[in-house]
Regions:
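Sec-dependent N-terminal signal peptides
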Residues: 4-14
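Extracellular/lumen-exposed scaffold segments
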Residues: 18-129
Length: 131
């Protein structure tokens, strides 16, 4: 499965954990969850992306095996911010005889680590392109 998203996420200094962002595609849904209720300066914060797919659809692991393309994540961040990840869980085997691929059916949860600089604005934006 290959799809593109352009997502603009506005995060505030006091970001509430109950506030999530959801994006729907034709066969998948992305939910974004912050780790805690605040994004602090000079810290590491976990931003989790949950990808849910329709029955019969899947997405590939970082090493997709015999066929498919791995998910790639490109972030546009404010100056001084750094994003690493995702931290990949172990994949499922997805057989396409005679080929074997690796990925995720139904759902995958991918944590990213957002490192903030010593001084951050009260409001900032992150842009994610998921290919």
């Amino acid at each position: 499965m290959k799809f593109k998203f352009f997502i603009l996420i506005s995060l505030f200094f006091s970001l509430h954990t109950q506030a999530t962002l959801s994006i729907n595609d034709s066969h998948s849904k992305l939910n974004f969850y912050p780790e805690s209720n605040e994004i602090n300066a000079n810290s590491e914060n976990i931003l989790t992306i949950e990808i849910s797919m329709d029955k019969g659809w899947h997405t590939y692991w970082i090493n997709p095996g015999d066929s498919g393309d791995p998910a790639e994540f490109e972030w546009e961040l404010p100056e001084g911010f750094q994003m690493s990840g995702p931290i990949w869980p172990s994949p499922d085997k997805i057989p396409f005889p005679p080929l074997m691929t690796y990925g995720f059916d139904d759902q995958v949860i991918l944590p990213f680590i957002l490192k903030t600089p010593k001084i951050i604005p009260k409001q900032f934006e992150l842009s994610l392109i998921h290919i």
